[in-house]
Amino acid sequence: PMTRPRILINFAITADGKTSTRAKDPAHFTSKLDLHRLLEIRKRADAILVGRGTLEADEMSMTIPAELKPEIQPLRCIVSRGGKFDLSHKVFNTQGGTVHLLSSDPPPEYNPRPYQNAGAIVHQCPLVDFLHRLRTEYNVETLLCEGGGSLVRALAELDAIDEVNLTWATHTIFGGENAPSITGALGPHLPASLEFALTHFEPLDNGEVFLTYERLKTSTT
């Protein structure tokens, strides 16, 4: 089995299982309670992992507010296949955990120096190797992935998701064949089914439901 952190994902989904509209607008369809839950889940993580598109769409700083008194600020890990990042983005200009940039398929002439000069650590390797490195070299025991869908799909293809946290917003329906789900746009099936058990079910008065699912590890005997 691969050496990697325990990996959690956290998403808000609509009644019809969408994470955003067809236009990929930022997900602002949930309540303040959902934001509070997001931050509580972040406090469990040694590192946060997002795709570059999600980082830019949601204007994330990938931090935990000081008033929540986090023991640490998690490492901030951002994935871009070609390794292009916007140095004016606030993630490079806010106090927080060290920024780790993963270019999983860099072009031959790739130059990481501008990002290194901005204080980031740049990795050029496949996602599976990056996960191994986070666990073995950076002591990341718990990694929280906050999207987007293509990154979650890549984790699912590696069978590298241990816990799924969802805020199910039953008050909102987006519809649309092209609106993304937690694994992105509709596409081919995963290589194999992944079995999860519902471990937390918490309906709120506002039409939202907090759900947690744990990966069931089937014995391979």
Language-model regions, residue ranges each:
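Enzymes that bind and transform nitrogen-containing heteroaromatic metabolites
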Residues: P1-T221
